[in-house]
């Protein structure tokens, strides 16, 4: 105890180094004779408008030029966990990273390359920020309350309905198959859960812009709040769990690492009703039988105004602009994840997952796409692991490429070194 950081506070650390690169292929070309158009991404002819790629150019070449280099970013997290009674928790997380310039941050040219560990403060690279600040405490028998100015949706769930992955690679496989429902919204919020036996019921609210007093830009329960309200009913045991959840989102939805550009636009411009069904089973001890996790999500966009940036997805071609209202449309997602513990050597884990990132399933768009990843986590010491991984995206732009019959894909590989202390 003489060497403790504090009599009430424990320090936990996480650092991840990611070294790797991505390649791109396919015959997709940007729409000819159209200058860069920031408000939209595809024309009425279905061809992609590159938003920076030269008109008529091959998009795979543009992607390689802007996101094809070897890169070596990092993510650092320091958790200060304080307990005053032995049953409560005040968590303060300090976080820094420099992923914004990498292909793994969830930005163009391929948002679905986003990684779970890809972080950078809005203030810039290598800047330390307060990423979490919340207080959690029991109330009576079976109830737990959580509130704070920097709390995430999953911090307030009694159970997370997935055992996959033992080590994260692509972000899309870390949302229990339903990123619309489990959006991991982060901001000001509060929640309550109840547990009895194997059953649990959780309810929470998060406003991503809850620090603002301007109702048009933020606040609690306002138009600008970028808010989510979630209810989850779950049942689980020592090695299994299943859950059904509902989330209402208003101005807070997907980012590029969660779905196709069209699906992401639907969330950005509409209020959304989302449901998710997720389950997992893990053997009590390592065996030939894998841990299996599965999940499915369905989202319905609630229609509204057709003003640009509100409910519409903008398209354009030379001398012409149009809007597509996604109000009333729907999108879906699903995944299956498998992993085997103590594979080849004790402490090592191998796993893979596949599925469809969020894609629009109505309005006649051919927005479907597939993602796959495989990895092998080598536990070098109790505190250090090294994970080589590869991954593939079949049609990361969805309808933007498929409606014109053109192809575009991405393949990548990396080595992730993780330190826990």
Describe each model-derived feature in a short phrase:
Residues 1-145, 173-177, 181-199, 203-204, ...:
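Beta-barrel outer-membrane channel/assembly domains of diderm bacteria
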Residues 25, 157-160, 204, 213-217:
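A short secondary-structure junction signal
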Residues 100-103, 150-164, 350-358:
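Surface-exposed extracellular loop regions of Gram-negative outer-membrane beta-barrel proteins
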Residues 160-174:
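Short, flexible helix-coil linker/hinge segments at the edges of structured domains or between repeats
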């Amino acid at each position: 105890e003489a060497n403790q950081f504090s009599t009430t506070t424990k320090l936990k650390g996480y650092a991840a180094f990611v070294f790797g690169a991505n390649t791109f292929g396919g015959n997709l070309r940007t729409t000819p004779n159209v200058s860069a158009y920031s408000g939209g991404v595809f024309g009425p002819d279905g061809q992609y408008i590159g938003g920076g790629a030269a008109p008529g150019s091959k998009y795979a070449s543009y992607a390689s030029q802007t996101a094809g280099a070897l890169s070596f970013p990092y993510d650092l997290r320091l958790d200060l966990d304080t307990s005053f009674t032995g049953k409560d928790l005040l968590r303060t997380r300090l976080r820094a990273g420099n992923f914004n310039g990498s292909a793994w941050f969830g930005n163009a040219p391929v948002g679905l390359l986003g990684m779970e560990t890809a972080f950078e403060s809005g203030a810039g690279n290598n800047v330390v920020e307060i990423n979490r600040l919340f207080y959690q405490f029991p109330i009576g028998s079976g109830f737990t309350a959580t509130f704070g100015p920097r709390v995430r949706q999953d911090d307030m769930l009694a159970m997370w309905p997935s055992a996959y992955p033992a080590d994260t690679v692509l972000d899309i496989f870390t949302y229990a198959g339903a990123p619309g429902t489990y959006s991991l919204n982060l901001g000001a919020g509060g929640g309550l859960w109840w547990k009895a036996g194997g059953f649990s019921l959780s309810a929470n609210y998060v406003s991503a812009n809850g620090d603002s007093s301007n109702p048009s830009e933020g606040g609690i329960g306002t138009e600008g709040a970028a808010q989510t309200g979630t209810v989850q009913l779950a049942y689980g045991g020592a090695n299994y769990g299943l859950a059904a959840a509902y989330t209402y989102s208003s101005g807070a939805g997907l980012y590029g690492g969660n779905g196709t550009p069209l699906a992401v636009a639907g969330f950005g411009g509409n209020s959304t009703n989302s449901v998710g069904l997720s389950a997992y089973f893990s053997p009590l001890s390592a065996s030939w039988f894998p841990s299996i996790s599965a999940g499915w999500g369905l989202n319905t966009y609630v229609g509204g105004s057709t003003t640009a940036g509100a409910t519409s997805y903008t398209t354009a071609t030379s001398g012409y602009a149009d809007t597509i209202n996604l109000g009333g449309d729907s999108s879906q997602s699903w995944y299956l994840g498998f992993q085997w513990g103590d594979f080849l050597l004790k402490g090592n884990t191998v796993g893979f997952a596949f599925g469809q990132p969020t894609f629009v399933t109505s309005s006649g768009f051919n927005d479907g796409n597939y993602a796959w990843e495989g990895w092998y986590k080598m536990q070098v010491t109790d505190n250090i692991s090294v994970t080589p991984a590869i991954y593939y995206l079949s049609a990361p732009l969805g309808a933007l490429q498929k409606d014109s019959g053109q192809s575009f894909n991405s393949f990548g590989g990396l080595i992730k070194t993780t330190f826990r202390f």
